UniProtKB/Swiss-Prot annotation:
HAMAP family: RNApol_bact_RpoC. It catalyses: RNA(n) + a ribonucleoside 5'-triphosphate = RNA(n+1) + diphosphate. Mg(2+) binds at D739, D741, D743. Keywords: DNA-directed RNA polymerase, Magnesium, Metal-binding, Nucleotidyltransferase, Transcription, Transferase, Zinc. Belongs to the RNA polymerase beta' chain family. It comes from Thermus thermophilus (strain ATCC BAA-163 / DSM 7039 / HB27). It is an enzyme of class 2 (transferase). The gene is rpoC. This is DNA-directed RNA polymerase subunit beta'.
């Protein structure tokens, strides 16, 4: 037996849960091998993970057949089982890095953001890698403020905290720095021309563009000087004096050779070479001028240079050592000289300097590295490197600590204040930071930074969610709820609701971040080969593929240790791939199909919207055993029949027919029978006979889309017909809103006997005669039927001799013989009004009269005298015939004569009343027979009457011309008055419109007067008068004048259309007309959609309302007023009869009422007669209002009780338990919505025709509880009005005892209250629509409920739609279902929390019982959409709108759906808990007396057995709580 589902719970899945669902990890993005068409291993369709493609067959084919079931093939690893497992076996993708679930990120408000107290923007910045979030600040300080946990940091801020504060100053090419690399700088110091440091710190070069190497040169050289002039020293520094010569001195060569002169910046070397070998090297200091040139050959003793005055060392050369040899008066100095020779190297962007500033290099050391070894710079000799022209200077905030001895830290270490750096503890750090050891300058730099833990992406968010202590957070937020600021409290409440949802449901916040992504079973995302060898695939496969590709790439990059920026980008792309899979297009641009702009359908798209799983597949499935065809009229059918084409019936009833054929021996077995049916030509007559037998006693359902109310589907007994069309009974057309201009209908077969019984009893067309919306007949004569019946019951009034008086009947008859008086002319005989016909033809009984008609003696329309049941009736044979027709149909002549009025012609309304009265007095079956009779005779007489219309039937009255001339004269006067300045332009416009409206009205009256007096049998007139077709406005346009037209803007043209259609319109008139007509058409199209949407919203808000019990026992009631204030005078007047009927009919009296001497007891169902009695009593001033039970005050949870609901209007009897009255209410309100909309185009956009612009939008505004645009100012208190007027504004004061309330209004406000008026709270002070929310605050829920019902009714009444108040009340009750907590008392509720009134009341009862403080609340008014979304059933809400939001909220709270309403049960494929599916009906058994006796005896025995102790041992006892 199938287990019955009791509840459905939705929750978050933990990563472990997701992995436990999975049958294996999908590692590759491959799907199917296009050659073998087999799934790829580890791919999205892998058979090892998801199961075999063919039943009981592994992938390699080693194991086939069912006997190997459950075995896993050792070759291919596929389990041998049914292929259906591919519909529910899931896989998973293990993510390389966690990813957030977009529903919990982008929902409004974001669930993750709410928990972590991050805004949506902040959360997005972290998840998509544009900002860091702090997990552990570790004492970090940013701009003098301590960094906090969960603070967001930009890349710069993070780098500053993690790697120190630094600023980069770019330098233009060719500009050299003014500070050295590694030099300490202060704020404001110039780093380069025009570049100033904004920071204290250390300047570091970035990408120097030029390197200067100062090579150290050494040379041993000699110099002979006069001894007396020599300034003796052991070494000479650059620029020091060597000698002071008193007179010029010539320095001579001491060897012969070739001169080689090497000049320095100052001074020079002179080398003498012999055969290329140097023989002597001389030093020429500053002050000594060479006398020889390079390459000159010199002799020994030849002067080489001349010296004068001071001789000194060049500025860049020093003598490290001096050896002196004195020879007589001269001294020969051997000098060991050292100097630097700079060499510059350009550094290109692709090259890299590998030594620091000031570094000493040896010959062969690399200074600049490059990709091409040829471009590298290698040291030519020993030297010192200097860096120049950096691309930029980086100033790092760092402390510099010089040291002497050994360093105790190394580069990259992190230190805190007080940590030892060098020199055995003498040098210590006094800041947090990262160490850089500079051995060139013997310093330790500590770059000020922190070991802060801040991260990006879902990983960081997951860590924070894991660390959340929900209990502590709850306590903290409860404290915050005591804060005086309302905004702070509201924010805390929202967070607290989420926290509690997690706490109560047992979900963990970190589960909102995915570590593994589940992979949908492959048969739910199929891939099929289409013609041409290409593959058609579900969009999900593309989305999964993207995800797997990115995931695998990220894994690879992580394994390779790729740079942070690449990893970060890949992680972001992975997050975006997960987002696209879950909800494509929710963030950023949607992922589209390659080659088109169509966004891919993600999992969210598959669920939500009209084409989503909920609405397309769960709430509305296509069904088998159905067909559709065009409908044609079937006038010969009975009300409960429909004509079904034979071929269609054959297909629909095929299984039944096959069985019957086998039974009757037409075919040996079912297979043969099926083959016989497939060969269409071979179908024998026996088959058709068998089909007749099969359908005998069965019913089928006919449906016409759009199904706006329950009468859009009705059951009929099929009658087999030739042809291809379904034949429909004319009288059900109104319920279906069907006509025969090409409409199609669908046929469905209820299969089970239960379904057949239900269709036959509940849905048969003959059982659905009254409208559930108003209780009026829906199956009633219309069109031709009315015309025929009106034709025979109309009487002739002739003019000839009318008004003549005769003394005796004989005189009158003689005058008639002479042709002076017509048969039907009204005359007086002996002072009594009569006619010749009544005198001449006196019949003893109705049969005689009808016989006379048959013999052509009198016409059906002549007035004659008939004796009947002891009475003399003056009536026409036609009316007698009509009475006879009714009598035969209802099989009760007495009742028939009571039902019909013989003194009026039978038109639309009288026929409707006849049907209704017949229903009340005679019941359903006889009424159905009556309808068939009326249909038959109506068609017969409308045919034989020969009534049809031609152009000449549109008769134009003589008076029209005169009325138009009169109007033109008045028009001239208005224009003159305007010209002379007596009227403003607006007044002139209004007066012209008024004039033409009056003129049109006069012409209309003239048209009808003309018809009545001169052409009473004019077909046009007959049709309009009888209600068969056309209305006075259309007749006016045909015969009178079209009148005023509307502009596209909705205003009215002041020039009317003077012509009628009979006369034809001028070009200008035609043009003017076209606007309105087109607007009507456009309106219709647009508003049909709005109306359908409204119906959908109404159904969604009311579907759970079912009649659940007989009496809820409430003492509350509503008072239906019988009077209402006049719009203009504000004095009370009796409400319209129809309005009172809509409020009272079928209700239960809540208090006893005695009127006009009749006592109506409490608990009585008010019939229409009772209502009429109450109206009479109101007219007599005996009663002002009637106390009745109402759904608004019903105490039944999730529904209403019989008493509060009253009559089932479609049956005119108390409603049955289990009736889905909520849906009936929604349909009753929604169905006319489309009529309202479509009403426009009938009048072709004539001005004055009620255009629904006030209609539907107003209804929607009321049901959505929107604040109206032009809203009235309402008084918030009871009091007396005082008005003060100033230059720019009006002040209206409402004053009550010791209290006054002021309302400031603009000068042009149209006041409703006068100075000194007494007003009540909630009463409008100015014109406009009342804001229901304000009314609720001022006057309470009852006032709002009455206001909404009344305002909605106003719109429907304006359109002539009858609708019972209780339908609107049911919807309004659902709008008023919720309350807001103002003080939680001793409960766990929160201030501002919204929940159902029932729940609060139940909670309060419990609190009071426990002696605790109850919850204080205020009523809320919610629009139907919001109310529907707030329902407890998450299945119902999710299938309505905002699917993702509803499911997100429900999942977090771990909501359980109790399956109370209808939608949730339909979604799960259960019987709906209404009608025959309600427990009341399902568990009610119908038994005969014998069974009843047996049950009674069994019950007695059970009681006795219970009283006897269980003596025998081993008696199996039922476990408590288990159902036996």
């Amino acid at each position: 037996m199938k287990k019955e589902v009791r509840k459905v719970r939705i929750a978050l899945a933990s990563p472990e849960k997701i992995r436990s669902w999975s049958y294996g990890e999908v590692e590759k993005p491959e799907t199917i091998n296009y050659r073998t068409l087999k799934p790829e291993r580890d791919g999205l369709f892998d058979e090892r993970i998801f199961g075999p493609i063919k039943d009981y067959e592994c992938a390699c084919g080693k194991y086939k057949r069912q006997r190997f079931e459950g075995k896993v093939c050792e070759r291919c690893g596929v389990e041998v089982t049914k292929s259906i497992v591919r519909r529910y076996r899931m896989g998973h993708i293990e993510l390389a890095t966690p990813a957030a679930h977009i529903w919990f990120v982008k929902d409004v408000p974001s669930k993750i953001g709410t928990l972590l107290d991050l805004s949506a923007t902040e959360l997005e910045q972290v998840l998509y890698f544009s900002k860091y979030i702090v997990l552990d600040p570790k004492g970090a300080i940013l701009n003098g403020v301590p960094v906090e946990k969960r603070q967001l940091l930009t890349d710069e801020e993070y780098r500053e905290l993690r790697y120190g504060k630094q600023e980069t100053y770019p330098l233009p090419p060719g500009v050299d720095a003014l500070v050295k690399d590694g030099e300490e700088v202060v704020k404001g110091q110039e780093l380069a021309p025009g570049v100033v440091s904004r920071l204290d710190g250390v300047a570091l070069y970035r990408f120097p563009r030029r390197v200067r190497v100062e090579y150290v040169k050494k040379e041993r050289a000699g110099l002979r000087l006069p001894l007396a002039a020599w300034v003796e020293k052991e070494a000479y520094k650059p620029g020091e004096i060597l000698a002071e010569l008193p007179e010029p001195y010539l320095f001579r060569a001491e060897e012969e050779g070739v001169v080689e002169l090497k000049e320095l910046e100052e001074g020079a070397f002179l080398v003498l070479r012999q055969e290329d070998e140097p023989v002597a090297t001389y030093f020429l200091p500053v002050g000594m001028t060479p006398l020889v040139v390079h390459g000159e050959i010199v002799e020994k003793g030849q002067p080489l240079a001349e010296a004068k005055g001071l001789l000194r060392m060049p500025r860049q050369v020093r003598a490290a050592q001096v050896e002196a040899e004195e020879e007589g008066e001269t001294v020969y100095l051997t000098l060991f000289l050292e100097w630097t020779e700079p060499k510059d190297y350009r550094v290109q962007p692709h090259m890299n300097v590998v030594v620091p500033e000031g570094a000493r290099v040896e010959a062969g050391d690399k200074i600049v590295a490059a990709i091409d070894p040829e471009e590298e710079v290698i040291a030519e000799a020993e030297g010192v490197v200097h860096l120049h022209e950096p691309a930029s200077i980086l100033v790092v905030k760092a402390r510099v600590y010089p040291f002497e001895d050994d360093v105790e830290v190394s580069t990259g270490d992190r230190v805190a204040p007080g940590d030892v750096l060098a020199d055995g503890g003498k040098v210590k750090s006094d800041v947090y930071g990262r160490v850089e050891v500079d051995l060139v300058r013997n310093v330790v730099r500590v770059v000020e930074s922190y070991d802060i833990d801040a991260r990006m992406g879902a990983e960081a968010i997951q860590q924070l969610l894991k660390e959340l202590d929900l209990e502590a957070l709850e306590k903290e937020l409860l404290e915050e709820m005591k804060h005086p600021s309302r905004a702070r409290r509201a924010k805390a409440r929202k967070r607290l609701e989420v926290v509690r949802a997690f706490l109560d449901s047992g979900n963990r916040p970190e589960w909102m971040i995915l570590e593994a992504v589940p992979v949908l079973p492959p048969d739910l995302r199929p891939m099929v080969q289409v013609d041409g060898g290409r593959f058609a695939t579900s969009d999900l496969n593309d989305l999964y593929r993207r995800l797997i590709n990115r995931n695998n790439r990220l894994k690879k990059l992580l394994a390779q240790g790729a740079p942070e920026i690449i990893i970060r980008n890949e992680k972001r792309m992975l997050q975006e791939a997960v987002d696209a899979l879950l909800d494509n297009g929710r963030r950023g641009a949607p992922v589209t199909n390659p080659g088109s702009d169509r966004p891919l359908r993600s999992l969210t798209d598959i669920l939500s919207g009209k084409q989503g799983r909920f609405r397309q597949n769960l709430l509305g499935k296509r069904v088998d055993y159905s067909g559709r065809s065009v409908i044609v009229v079937g006038p010969q059918l009975k009300l409960h029949q429909c004509g079904l084409p034979k071929r269609m019936a054959l297909e629909l009833f095929k299984p039944f027919l096959l069985k019957k054929m086998e039974e009757k021996g037409i075919a040996p077995n079912v297979k043969a029978a099926r083959r016989m049916l497939e060969r269409q030509r071979d179908i024998k007559d026996e088959v058709w006979d068998a089909l007749e037998e099969v359908i005998h006693g069965k019913v089928v359902l006919l449906n016409r889309a759009p199904t706006l109310h329950r009468l859009g589907i009705q059951a009929f007994q099929p009658v087999l017909v030739e042809g291809q069309s379904i034949q429909l009974h004319p009288l059900v057309c109104e319920a279906f809103n069907a006509d025969f201009d090409g409409d199609q209908m669908a046929v469905h077969v209820p299969l089970s006997s239960f379904a057949q019984a239900e269709a036959r009893i509940q849905m048969l067309s003959a059982h659905n005669l009254l409208s559930p919306a108003s209780g009026e007949p829906l199956a009633k004569p219309s069109r031709d039927i009315i015309l025929g019946l009106y034709y025979i019951t109309q009487v002739r009034k002739e003019k000839k001799g009318a008004g003549l008086e005769f003394a005796t009947p004989e005189e009158a008859l003689a005058a008639h013989e002479r042709g002076e008086v017509a048969l039907n002319a009204p005359i007086k005989v002996a002072g009594r009004e009569t006619s010749v016909g009544r005198l001449k033809y006196v019949f003893a009984n109705p049969d005689e009269a009808l016989l006379a008609v048959a013999h052509g003696i009198v016409d059906l329309q002549d007035v004659v005298t008939v004796r009947y049941m002891g009475k003399r009736l003056e009536t026409s044979p036609g009316r007698i015939l009509f009475a006879r027709i009714v009598a035969e149909a209802v099989e009760d002549e007495k009742v028939a004569w009571e039902l019909i009025q013989l003194d009026v012609p039978q038109e639309k309304n009288s026929l409707k009343d006849l049907v209704y009265q017949a229903f009340l007095r005679l019941g359903m079956e006889k009424t159905a027979r009556l309808l068939d009779a009326l249909k038959y005779y109506g068609f017969t007489f409308s045919t034989t009457s020969g009534i049809t219309i031609g152009i000449d039937d549109a008769v134009i009255p003589e008076e029209k011309k005169q009325y138009l001339e009169e109007a033109d004269r008045k028009l001239l006067q208005i224009e003159q008055a305007y010209e002379m300045g007596f009227l403003t332009d607006r007044e002139r416009y209004d007066q012209i419109l008024q004039l033409w409206t009056e003129t049109t009205e006069k012409v209309t009256q003239a048209v009808f007067k003309n018809f009545e007096e001169n052409y009473p049998f004019n077909p046009l007139y007959v049709m309009a008068q009888s209600g068969a077709r056309g209305n006075p406005q259309q007749i006016r346009q045909l015969c009178g004048m079209r009148g005023l037209m509307q502009k596209p803007s909705g205003e009215t043209f002041e020039v009317p259309v003077r012509s009628s259609f009979r006369e034809g319109l001028t070009v200008l008139e035609y043009f003017i007309s076209s606007h309105g007509a087109r607007k009507g058409g456009a309106d219709t199209a647009l508003r049909t959609a709005d109306s359908g949407y409204l119906t959908r919203k109404l159904v969604d808000v009311t579907h759970e309302i079912v009649v659940r019990e007989a009496d809820c026992g409430t003492t509350n009631y509503i008072s239906v007023p019988l009077f209402q204030p006049d719009e203009v005078t504000r004095s009370l007047r009796l409400r319209k009869r129809a309005d009172i009927e809509a409020g009272l009919y079928g209700r239960v009296l809540a208090r006893e009422v005695e009127v006009l001497g009749v006592r109506l007891e409490e608990g009585r169902y008010l019939s229409m007669d009772d209502v009429h009695l109450l109206i009479k009593a109101a007219e007599a001033g005996e009663i002002q209002e009637v106390p009745v039970r109402s759904p608004l005050t019903c105490q039944t949870r999730y529904g209403v009780c019989q008493k509060c609901y009253g009559y089932d209007l479609s049956m005119a009897r108390p409603v049955s338990i289990g009736e889905a009255v909520g849906i009936v209410a929604a349909q009753s309100i929604g169905e006319p919505g489309t009529q309202l909309t479509m009403r426009t185009f009938h009048t072709g956009g004539v001005a004055g025709a009620a255009d629904i612009t006030q209609g539907l939008p107003r209804v929607i505004e009321l049901f959505e509880a929107r604040r109206p645009k032009a809203k009235a100012v309402i008084s918030e208190i009871d009091g007396v009005v005082r008005i003060e007027e100033t230059e720019e504004k009006l002040s209206v004061f409402v004053e009550s005892e010791g209290f006054s309330k002021e309302y400031k209004l603009p000068k042009e406000a149209r006041l409703l209250a006068k100075d000194g008026d007494y007003v009540e709270a909630g009463q409008p002070l100015t014109r406009g629509a009342i804001d229901p929310h304000q009314l609720l605050e001022a006057k309470g829920p009852e006032a709002v409920e009455r206001y909404l019902v009344e305002e909605i009714q106003k719109v429907y009444r304006a359109q002539g739609v009858k609708l019972h108040d209780k339908h609107i009340e049911i919807v309004v009750r659902q709008m008023m279902k919720y309350v807001e907590v103002t003080d939680p008392g001793d409960s766990r509720l929160l201030e501002g929390q919204v929940l159902e009134k029932w729940d609060v009341e139940a909670l309060n009862e419990r609190l009071i019982a426990e002696g605790k403080t109850p919850v204080a609340w205020k009523p809320l008014l919610m629009g139907v959409t919001k109310s529907a979304l707030s329902t407890k059933s998450w299945l119902s809400a999710a299938s309505f709108q905002n699917t993702t939001h509803v499911l997100t909220e429900a999942a977090i709270a771990g909501k359980k759906d109790e399956l109370i309403g209808l939608k949730e049960n339909v979604i799960l494929g259960r019987l709906i808990p209404a009608g025959t599916g309600s427990d009341f009906v399902r568990f009610t058994q119908v038994v005969d007396q014998k069974t009843l006796k047996a049950i009674e005896e069994a019950r007695k025995e059970a009681v006795e057995a219970k009283e006897r102790p269980a003596a025998r041992r081993g008696v199996k006892r039922e476990q408590p709580g288990k159902q036996a």
